[in-house]
């Protein structure tokens, strides 16, 4: 005899008005005070499900939404939505169980974003873990080249820059140094850190100071290599530092660091988690700087994070890309994210979107430079590459106040960076009209700063 059990009653979830209260019972809720309407929001416009207020999104979920929210290439294609839903029903372990969507994603990624000199791909969830696995690849490479045993590998080091943000995982915690609250009281490695010679703009005005900053940084790098006595596995840098202040570096400085790595038999590793996937107007920022990295960490806009590898990695035949389980994870990324990323990359390719990024980026940068001219001594250091643009304000307090006024008074969301930087991270599809609204909000917020 089979007993029929009454169906369990599933309690109704919270409605929009209760979201923050429901979350606050269990998680920290110190983010934006809007409740995102996942249906009404579209493109660069985020809608508050409680008030109906529309916000201009110039932060794109911390530079992770390449086409904004609910892009038409996805939501207006019912067949593709079905394909995406089918991929979301299950979560297979991609490194060991293979599917057509996985293969389609990998081939699309290689075609749209790939570098022939970096043929190896590794996928994982999270930008910090992308960097983490790039470091593991570098440690493994260096250890094999030197013939180090398990005890000796503990002497290996990572040369890196001040004001870096590379994540909050194990190895990366020793490299991130933007905000002490993110790294304090966690055990860290004492790895060599050199000054970050961020370019001051306009470049013509600050040429001598910029050259001197680069000279000091290169001297510090030379000394770090000397002191490490051959134990530096790699140099790791963001080609443009994001959270640390939207700090740009000259091609000459980065090329000099690359040359130092070659001379001292260390890998040259770039973190393009924020700057990659078209934000600067090319697939990767390093392509505009004359660089040939050995490893590149990626994430955010790519939807699936990971590492591209090549270059001198091939000097060691049994590198981590060739040996089973040297680097891996259960899921190796997320299949649903891969399906979404495939459509995003196809759209970037089909629409020649990166050409538009170059044009819109110049438009935004010109607007920021005009604001700097109108507010001398207040708005300074207008800078950008593609849509990765920023300005500086006099101090942290004034910067934060301007951002608050942009948000509360003009419904525009931008981001802080460094101690006094204000950065824009719009979707790649942003229009000149939308950039105008953002620039006008910044101008009005500056005018009302008191």
UniProtKB/Swiss-Prot annotation:
Q: Which reaction does it catalyse?
A: L-lysine + 2-oxoglutarate = (S)-2-amino-6-oxohexanoate + L-glutamate
Chain sites annotated for binding pyridoxal 5'-phosphate: 127-128, 274
Residues holding L-lysine: 168
- Residues with the modification N6-(pyridoxal phosphate)lysine, per the entry, are 300
User: What are the alphabetically sorted keywords of the record?
Assistant: Aminotransferase, Antibiotic biosynthesis, Pyridoxal phosphate, Transferase
SUPFAM superfamilies from the entry?
A: PLP-dependent transferases
Q: What is its EC number?
A: 2.6.1.36
Biological pathway: Antibiotic biosynthesis; cephamycin C biosynthesis
What cofactor is this protein dependent on? pyridoxal 5'-phosphate
Superkingdom, natural source: Bacteria
Q: Which GO terms describe its molecular function?
A: L-lysine 6-transaminase activity; pyridoxal phosphate binding
Which residues does 2-oxoglutarate bind?
168, 274, 423
A Gene Ontology BP annotation from the UniProt entry: gamma-aminobutyric acid catabolic process
Q: Which InterPro entries match?
A: Aminotrans_3, L-lysine_6-transaminase, PyrdxlP-dep_Trfase, PyrdxlP-dep_Trfase_major, PyrdxlP-dep_Trfase_small
What PANTHER family does the database record attribute to this sequence?
Answer: 4-AMINOBUTYRATE AMINOTRANSFERASE GABT, AMINOTRANSFERASE
Q: Report the function annotation for this chain.
A: Catalyzes the transfer of the terminal amino group of L-lysine to alpha-ketoglutarate to yield L-glutamate and 2-aminoadipate 6-semialdehyde ((S)-2-amino-6-oxohexanoate), which is spontaneously converted to the dehydrated form 1-piperideine 6-carboxylate.
Family designation:
Belongs to the class-III pyridoxal-phosphate-dependent aminotransferase family.
Name of this protein? L-lysine-epsilon aminotransferase
């Amino acid at each position: 005899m089979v007993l029929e059990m009454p169906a369990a009653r599933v309690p109704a979830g919270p409605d929009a008005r209760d979201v923050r209260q429901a979350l606050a019972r269990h998680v920290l809720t110190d983010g934006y005070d809007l409740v995102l309407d996942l249906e009404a929001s579209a493109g660069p416009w985020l809608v508050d499900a409680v008030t109906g207020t529309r916000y201009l999104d110039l932060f794109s979920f911390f530079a992770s939404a390449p086409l904004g929210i609910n892009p038409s290439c996805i939501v207006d294609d019912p067949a593709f939505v079905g394909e995406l839903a089918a991929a979301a029903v299950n979560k297979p372990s991609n490194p060991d169980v293979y599917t057509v969507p996985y293969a389609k994603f990998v081939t699309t990624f290689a075609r749209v974003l790939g570098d022939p000199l970096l043929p190896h791909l590794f996928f994982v969830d999270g930008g910090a873990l992308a960097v983490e696995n790039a470091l593991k690849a570098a440690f493994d490479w260096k250890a094999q080249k030197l013939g180090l045993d398990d005890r000796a590998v503990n002497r290996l080091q990572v040369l890196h820059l001040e004001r870096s943000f590379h994540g909050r995982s194990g190895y990366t915690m020793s490299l991130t140094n933007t905000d002490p609250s993110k790294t304090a009281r966690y055990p860290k490695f004492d790895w060599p850190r050199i000054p970050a010679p961020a370019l001051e703009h306009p470049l013509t005005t600050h040429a001598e100071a910029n050259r001197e900053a680069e000279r000091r940084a290169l001297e510090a790098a030379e000394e770090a290599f000397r002191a490490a006595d051959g134990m530096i596995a790699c140099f790791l840098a963001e080609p443009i530092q994001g959270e640390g202040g939207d700090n740009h570096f000259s091609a000459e400085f980065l090329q000099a660091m690359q040359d130092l790595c070659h001379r001292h038999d260390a890998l040259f590793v770039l973190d393009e988690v924020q700057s990659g996937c078209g934000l600067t107007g090319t697939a990767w920022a390093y392509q505009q700087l004359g660089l040939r990295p050995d490893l590149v960490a990626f994430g955010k806009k790519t939807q699936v994070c990971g590492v591209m590898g090549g270059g001198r990695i091939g000097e060691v035949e049994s590198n981590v890309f060739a040996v089973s389980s040297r680097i891996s994870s259960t899921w190796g990324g997320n299949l649903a994210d891969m399906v979404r990323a495939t459509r995003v990359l196809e759209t970037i390719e089909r629409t020649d979107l990166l050409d538009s990024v170059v044009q819109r980026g110049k438009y935004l940068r010109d607007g920021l430079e005009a604001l700097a001219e109108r507010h001398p001594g207040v708005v300074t250091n207008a800078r950008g590459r593609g849509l990765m643009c920023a300005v500086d304000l006099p101090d942290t307090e004034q910067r934060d106040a301007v951002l608050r006024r942009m948000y509360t008074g003009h419904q525009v969301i931008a981001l802080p960076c460094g101690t006094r930087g204000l950065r824009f991270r719009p979707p790649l599809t942003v229009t000149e009209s939308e950039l105008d609204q953002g620039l006008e909000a910044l101008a009005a917020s500056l005018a009302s700063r008191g």
